């Protein structure tokens, strides 16, 4: 039996703790050891959660440890994943029992698949991708590493996300649309053409959001 440590004990970390209790392998392949977070008081006022054991930086990886990263910001996710991988940490996938995954879909490590996610056939998913509840992924889609897909976002067939892309709640990618590295598609936005690297688009049709 492996011991799961959750990176991040804030709001999303608490959600992932609850997800882990309902995920494939809980109680047979892994149990939950606790959280890693540099904010020691992050769980103050919240009952029933395991303790914050250490910060990521100060934690010494044990042979029976496994990890999942519960950070919604893709930049911080990559930062802390890199720290632990340098310590030879082993990451697992958390897949809720209600999720559906189609034939010939390939997935890397450290992925989070929440309740009622629907991933179609022949999809390619890299490492450390988060799918929040009710995300739908069309056939032959490609998703790069450290992406975060928020609730009810949708990717059409043959669409593509490069690394570290964020789709906010209800974002839609039409079939064959590509979102380049580090870009953001805003909530309820519809991407009908390529989204350039490092940009944020918003609206229907999605256009460049200037600050």
Cite the ranges covered by each PLM segment.
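Short active-site oxyanion
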Residues: 3-4, 31-33, 64-68
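Short amphipathic alpha-helical segments
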Residues: 17-19, 79-83, 125, 196-197
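NAD(P)-binding Rossmann-fold cofactor-contacting core
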Residues: 25-44
């Amino acid at each position: 039996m492996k011991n799961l440590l959750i990176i991040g004990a804030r709001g999303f970390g608490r959600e992932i703790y609850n997800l882990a209790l309902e995920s494939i392998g809980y109680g047979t392949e892994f149990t939950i050891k606790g959280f890693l977070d540099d904010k020691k008081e992050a769980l103050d006022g919240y009952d029933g959660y395991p303790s914050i054991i250490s910060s990521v930086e100060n934690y010494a990886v044990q042979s029976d440890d496994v990890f999942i990263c519960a950070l919604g910001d893709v930049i911080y996710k990559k930062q802390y994943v890199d720290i632990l991988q340098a310590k030879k940490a082993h990451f697992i996938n958390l897949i809720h029992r209600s999720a559906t995954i189609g034939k010939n879909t390939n997935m890397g490590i450290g992925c989070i698949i929440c309740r009622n996610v629907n991933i179609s056939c022949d999809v390619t998913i890299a490492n450390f991708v988060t799918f929040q509840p009710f995300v739908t992924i069309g056939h032959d889609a490609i998703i790069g590493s450290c992406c975060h897909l928020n609730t009810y976002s949708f990717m059409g067939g043959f669409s593509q996300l490069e690394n570290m892309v964020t789709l906010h709640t209800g974002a839609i990618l039409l079939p064959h649309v590509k979102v380049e590295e580090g870009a953001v598609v805003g909530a309820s936005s519809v991407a009908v053409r390529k989204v350039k690297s490092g940009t944020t688009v918003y609206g229907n049709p999605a256009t460049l959001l200037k600050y």
